[in-house]
């Protein structure tokens, strides 16, 4: 009897200390896995800011002062930044008050850029059909669909990026009216709580090489039958390692 009385306070303490709300655990996990830097101030842009050469945002938060419209298609005029061919955007936090995050109109470098909350797409890669796009460091979270949308041709290099709560980290455009052969190289990426890390169109010769860690990510690399019919959705062909999707399965957990 005495032993039972002594154990009762310990049982009550343990019972009340256990969280019953599953979202509390998710919130803790998000804070632990998405290391967004502290903002040094905020800037609301009334129109898209175009970047030629190098723009260093000084780790301030930049937005457009508008509400996200979800997956409703936006355009260049809705972007926070548009980076011209050969431009560099670095040390920026993209706030939640925007429809489109960043456009690249050709080869570009996106360095230490963070998306607080992704709206339609975080980063759209456009251009004349070739070039190299570098995403170095930074991260994005809360993307219902795509983080990086690759519409142009060429090569995308994603290095040391962190992504959390997302639909797809990278997607080669599945139904652009003009299609290209595209490649993506992923290294040092940390991915948490997502549906698909990479989506490519293997029928157009797309390739992906992946060296990353992933926790609670359903598919690492998905191959689609891409189309140039903008009104048609591409069909999923397969998922997993292949000649087009190069990685060691399973990826290590983050």
Swiss-Prot record:
It comes from Aspergillus clavatus (strain ATCC 1007 / CBS 513.65 / DSM 816 / NCTC 3887 / NRRL 1 / QM 1276 / 107). The lineage of its organism: Eukaryota, Fungi, Dikarya, Ascomycota, Pezizomycotina. Pectinolytic enzyme consist of four classes of enzymes: pectin lyase, polygalacturonase, pectin methylesterase and rhamnogalacturonase. Among pectinolytic enzymes, pectin lyase is the most important in depolymerization of pectin, since it cleaves internal glycosidic bonds of highly methylated pectins. Favors pectate, the anion, over pectin, the methyl ester. This is Probable pectate lyase E. The gene is plyE. It comes from the Eukaryota. The keyword Plastid does not apply. It catalyses: Eliminative cleavage of (1->4)-alpha-D-galacturonan to give oligosaccharides with 4-deoxy-alpha-D-galact-4-enuronosyl groups at their non-reducing ends. Its main location: secreted. Glycans are attached at residue 175. Keywords: Calcium, Carbohydrate metabolism, Cell wall biogenesis/degradation, Glycoprotein, Lyase, Polysaccharide degradation, Secreted, Signal. InterPro entries: Pectate_lyase_PlyH/PlyE-like, Pectin_lyas_fold, Pectin_lyase_fold/virulence. GO terms for biological process: cell wall organization; pectin catabolic process. The keyword Lyase applies. It is found in: Secreted. Residues 228-254 are annotated as: Disordered. GO terms for molecular function: pectate lyase activity.
């Amino acid at each position: 009897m005495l032993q039972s009385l002594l154990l009762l306070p310990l049982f009550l303490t343990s019972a009340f200390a256990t969280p019953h709300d599953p979202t509390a655990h998710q919130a803790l996990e998000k804070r632990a896995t998405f290391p967004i830097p502290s903002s040094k101030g905020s800037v609301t842009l009334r129109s898209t800011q175009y970047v030629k050469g190098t723009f260093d945002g000084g780790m301030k938060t930049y937005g457009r002062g508008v509400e996200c419209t979800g997956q409703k298609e936006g355009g260049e005029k809705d972007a926070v930044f548009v980076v011209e061919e050969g431009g560099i955007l670095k040390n920026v936090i993209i706030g939640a008050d925007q429809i489109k995050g960043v456009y690249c109109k050709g080869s570009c470098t996106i360095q230490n850029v963070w998306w607080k909350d992704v709206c339609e797409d975080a980063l759209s890669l456009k251009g004349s059909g070739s070039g190299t796009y570098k995403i170095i460091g930074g991260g994005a979270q809360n993307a219902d669909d795509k983080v990086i949308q690759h519409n142009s041709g060429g090569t995308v290099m994603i290095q040391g990026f962190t992504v959390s709560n997302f639909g797809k980290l990278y997607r080669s455009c599945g139904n652009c009216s003009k299609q290209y052969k595209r490649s993506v190289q992923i290294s040092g990426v940390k991915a948490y709580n997502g549906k698909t890390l990479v989506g490519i169109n293997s029928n157009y010769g797309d390739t992906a090489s992946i060296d990353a860690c992933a926790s609670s990510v359903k598919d690492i690399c998905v191959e689609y039958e891409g189309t140039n019919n903008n009104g048609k959705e591409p069909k999923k062909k397969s998922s997993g390692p292949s000649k087009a999707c190069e990685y060691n399965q399973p990826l290590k957990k983050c």
